[in-house]
Structure formats: C-alpha cells, structure tokens
Amino acid sequence: MPLTPNDIHNKTFTKSFRGYDEDEVNEFLAQVRKDYEIVLRKKTELEAKVNELDERIGHFANIEETLNKSILVAQEAAEDVKRNSQKEAKLIVREAEKNADRIINESLSKSRKIAMEIEELKKQSKVFRTRFQMLIEAQLDLLKNDDWDHLLEYEVDAVFEEKE
C-alpha cells in the first residue's frame, strides 16, 4: 500500500542515544509531507487529465473508425458507379453499333433501290427517245410528203366562188 501524507506526519521514530535532532526531523517530515501532498495532488490531476485524454482518444478513435468505414463505403460506391458506368458505356456503344449497322443497311437498301430506279429511268428514257424519234421522223415524212404541195396549190377563193 502506498505511503500517504498522514503516514509521513504520524510516523514516529524510536529515540536512541546518539539520534537525530527531533525538531529537525519533524521539520523535514513536515516539508516531505507538504511536498508529497503536492506530488499526490499533481498525480491526481494528471490521472484526471490522462482519463480525459483517454476519453478524447477514444472519441477520436471512434471518429477515425467511422471515417474509415465512410471512406470504404465511398470507395465501394465509387467502384459501383464506375462499374455501372462502364456497363452503361458498353451498352451505349453496342446500341450505337446496332444503329450504325441499321443505318448502313438502310442506306445500302436505298442506294440499291435508287440504282434500280435509275436503270428503269434509263430504259424509259431510251423508249421515250425511240418513240419521240419515231414521231419526229413520222412528222418529217409527213412534211416531205407531196400532199403539202397540193395544199399550197389549192385556192381558197375558188372554194368560196363555187359555193356562191
């Protein structure tokens, strides 16, 4: 059991023939008692401060643990977001590729259709040209016909005179 200031104060020594001066010993013990009380008081204060600091350390340890957990949760959430973003990006790329293929196929189909229409128009223009040429040639033949000369010889006045 540790020594207390009262133990120091109440300590008695046996007297011997050539012993110490009693007043001097009592003064020294009184001084030791005062110093010991100061040391004990400081010890108590320091223990209280240590307890307070231990509580604060515990509090900060809890905060640290909470922050570490929060960081882990945030990292996991970030990884989830990253994974989901990558999946979504792949889906978008896949969808874009499908759309591109569809657009290309539609364009090829339209270009084939237009090419077929062009060929059909070429055929129709050849037919039209041939028919038009035949019409013009027929008209030229009519113009070259001698019947026109006969019409020019026909006199209109003579027709009116006959009717009168």
Curated annotation (Swiss-Prot):
Induction: Constitutively expressed. The keyword Cell wall biogenesis/degradation does not apply. It comes from the Bacteria. InterPro entries: DivIVA_domain, DivIVA_fam. Disruption phenotype: Misplacement of the septum during cell division, resulting in the formation of small, circular, anucleate minicells. It is found in: Cytoplasm. The keyword Cell cycle applies. Residues 29-107 form a coiled coil. Changing Y20C: No effect on localization. One of its GO terms (biological process) is peptidoglycan-based cell wall biogenesis. Keywords: Cell cycle, Cell division, Coiled coil, Cytoplasm, Septation, Sporulation. Belongs to the DivIVA family. Overexpression of DivIVA is lethal. Oligomers. Interacts with FtsZ, MinD, MinJ and Spo0J. The association with Spo0J is transient and occurs at a specific point during development. May act as a pilot protein, directing MinCD to the polar septation sites or by inhibiting MinCD at the midcell site of division. Required for polar localization of the chromosome during sporulation. This is Septum site-determining protein DivIVA. The gene is divIVA.
